[in-house]
Amino acid sequence: MSTTASTSSNNLTFTSIVKSFFESYSKTPQKLKIIDLFLIYTFITGVIVFTYCCLVGTYPFNSFLAAFISTVGCFVLTVCLRIQINPINNFGKTISIERAFTDYLLCNLILHLVVFNFLG
Amino acid sequence: MMMKSILITFIIASALLSSVFADIGGKRTLVVLDDLSIKKTHSTFFKNLENKGYKLQFEQSNTKVVLEKYGDFNFDNLILFSPTSESLSFSSADVTRFIDGGNNVLFAGSNVISENIRDIAAECGMEIEEDKTLIFDHFNYDKSQSDHSVLVADQFIDDSPIILQGLNKPILFKGIGHKIRNNPLNYAILTGSSTAFSAKAISGVSTKLMGKSCGLVSSLQARNNARVTFSGSLDLFSDKSFYSKIDNKESGNKEFVERLVSWTFQERGILRASELELVKISTESNSTVAPDVFTIKDEVKYSLKVEEFDGIKGKWVPYVGSLQLEVIMLDPYIRTFIKGDANGLYKIHFKLPDVYGVFTFEASIHKSGYSTLDHIYRKPILPFRHDSYERFIPAAFPYYATCFSMLIGTFIFSIIFLFNKDQLNK
């Protein structure tokens, strides 16, 4: 504990911060890493959709909303899943991974029903 | 039983027919006179009316005459040439009801005017000057006489040519003035010139009325298109006035009176609308709805025929002018002016607003001197049905792609997530 405090106080450069981030991130379980990857994917898609809308205009506004809601919704649901199965949060005693994942799938089903209704 | 029903049908049909024909240009006229000698001094005026087919019924002012019976009026026009008599058999309320029934009134004043006539004039937006006053003008008077109250008047109404039909000969006028209320329904048909003023006939003490606000002859066209005309001079309608001369040239009195009276008795300037056609030409909605159901943003054609009544021919002729069309739902969403063609047809193509609701298509003509025309038609404009929107727009393809990529992404993520053997250390 004391060593980390001393290093951070000594050289708080950008590279050292990034390095320590990746060091500690490598300790996260693989399942969470997969989730993080998917989160990045949904986030980038959302940004692309929004930029496209800014460039082309809001003409099929409902389609834009459907696409944007789809990305945002996926992102939020996946974040929720990540919170529930993360061991640090100690949800494991009340909510099992299987239960959390089933909830996640069910919510996704509802989300995509809404999205595809709205898309037309 | 059979006979009875046929008889009843016949009676109803004839009643309906008579009510239809009594509508415009009615000729039954009641003439109320102070004294029957007016019939002789004004004989040309009355003869002209009779020649045009008016059925005149002369009554002395104190004779009991019933204007209205069971909501039906016995006359279409009323000529009140009894300015002085206090014993008029009907009150100003009766006359007001007569006007409210859509009938026309012509009345004239003289040196002394009874309360009854004053009340009627006040109801019609004209405030007659005090008794024993006259309009004087020291510049525009008949030079052949020394009397400065015999005016050579030429300040005719000029913004409604239908009334006097372009009369420009000056007329001789001697009579009492009146103030005209500032009201779009009132027409100052003849006023004094800017040097005219109203003054006591004997003492010459002037009253407050002067200049162009001295009304000599004015009219009211009520909201129900009944027309009321008041002249400050009863002598204007007399034979003497008809054949009077100004500087050895014929005065315009006869023509003025003829045109004034024929307008007042609705021989012209009456409008009606018919043959409304409101058709959908094209639609932006993709579904196949019935052709008479309007949806938002439809392209429609609006066509209306407007005719005006020609009292001389006794028939309706096309009215060529301008018509205002409004498409209203609380606020006017569209307001346009349509020019009429030679057949009196007013046609326009336009796009319905992008708002749904019950809309009023209101065509109106408010032209001074003409009867007001308001043609109202209501029709709902529906929103697009769920299946009438455009689908598969090219601009939306990236959005479709996004949604599918999210779906497939979730699917692939689920497989990887489920088959991942890594245990979360608790």
Swiss-Prot record, chain A:
Residues 1-36, 82-99 are cytoplasmic. It comes from the Eukaryota. It is a multi-pass membrane protein. It is found in: Endoplasmic reticulum membrane. It holds the Pfam family DAD. One of its GO terms (biological process) is protein N-linked glycosylation. Pathway: Protein modification; protein glycosylation. One of its GO terms (cellular component) is oligosaccharyltransferase complex. The keyword Isomerase does not apply. Keywords: Endoplasmic reticulum, Membrane, Transmembrane, Transmembrane helix. InterPro entries: DAD/Ost2. Its main location: endoplasmic reticulum. The keyword Endoplasmic reticulum applies. The chain crosses the membrane at residues 37-57, 61-81, 100-120. Residues 58-60 are lumenal. PANTHER family: DOLICHYL-DIPHOSPHOOLIGOSACCHARIDE--PROTEIN GLYCOSYLTRANSFERASE SUBUNIT DAD1. Component of the oligosaccharyltransferase (OST) complex. Belongs to the DAD/OST2 family. Subunit of the oligosaccharyl transferase (OST) complex that catalyzes the initial transfer of a defined glycan (Glc(3)Man(9)GlcNAc(2) in eukaryotes) from the lipid carrier dolichol-pyrophosphate to an asparagine residue within an Asn-X-Ser/Thr consensus motif in nascent polypeptide chains, the first step in protein N-glycosylation. N-glycosylation occurs cotranslationally and the complex associates with the Sec61 complex at the channel-forming translocon complex that mediates protein translocation across the endoplasmic reticulum (ER). All subunits are required for a maximal enzyme activity. This is Dolichyl-diphosphooligosaccharide--protein glycosyltransferase subunit 2. It comes from Dictyostelium discoideum.
UniProtKB/Swiss-Prot annotation, chain B:
Residues 23-398 are lumenal. Keywords: Endoplasmic reticulum, Glycoprotein, Membrane, Signal, Transmembrane, Transmembrane helix. The keyword Coiled coil does not apply. InterPro entries: DDOST_48_kDa_subunit, OST48_MD, OST48_N. One of its GO terms (biological process) is protein N-linked glycosylation via asparagine. The keyword Transmembrane applies. Glycans are attached at residue 286. Component of the oligosaccharyltransferase (OST) complex. Subunit of the oligosaccharyl transferase (OST) complex that catalyzes the initial transfer of a defined glycan (Glc(3)Man(9)GlcNAc(2) in eukaryotes) from the lipid carrier dolichol-pyrophosphate to an asparagine residue within an Asn-X-Ser/Thr consensus motif in nascent polypeptide chains, the first step in protein N-glycosylation. N-glycosylation occurs cotranslationally and the complex associates with the Sec61 complex at the channel-forming translocon complex that mediates protein translocation across the endoplasmic reticulum (ER). All subunits are required for a maximal enzyme activity. It comes from Dictyostelium discoideum. GO terms for cellular component: oligosaccharyltransferase complex. PANTHER family: DOLICHYL-DIPHOSPHOOLIGOSACCHARIDE--PROTEIN GLYCOSYLTRANSFERASE 48 KDA SUBUNIT. This is Dolichyl-diphosphooligosaccharide--protein glycosyltransferase 48 kDa subunit. The chain crosses the membrane at residues 399-419. Belongs to the DDOST 48 kDa subunit family. Pathway: Protein modification; protein glycosylation. Residues 1-22 form the signal peptide. It is found in: Endoplasmic reticulum membrane. It is a single-pass type I membrane protein. It holds the Pfam family OST48_MD. Residues 420-426 are cytoplasmic.
